[in-house]
């Protein structure tokens, strides 16, 4: 059983675009949608509320280079529209969505991973998003508790 969880964050999908899998954006987003359902149906302790869910869109894949070039051949094309597909999935599943594309990008070194400074950017931005979701929820819960 799951203990009380405030928020479950799902940021997946990049490896789905490896050449051997041949997966396109909508299929990868559907996989994330299935994970949302798994979280929603996980057994909870009695009286525990369902956790909120945040889907995070990873930065777009740029041209893979080096050792990742063959492994991710065609990934740029197959992943095209992934953030939009994840945003649609978030709406369909009534969960929160955060797109990393406006704030960060993949490394120029291999086109797949993130440089160290990008982890810092993402961490700071994610902390603000998560804080906002948790504080907003607590304020709503507190107001419900104090309603007369």
Where are the regions a protein language model picked out?
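Alpha-helical cap/lid subdomain in secreted, periplasmic
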Residues: 1-148
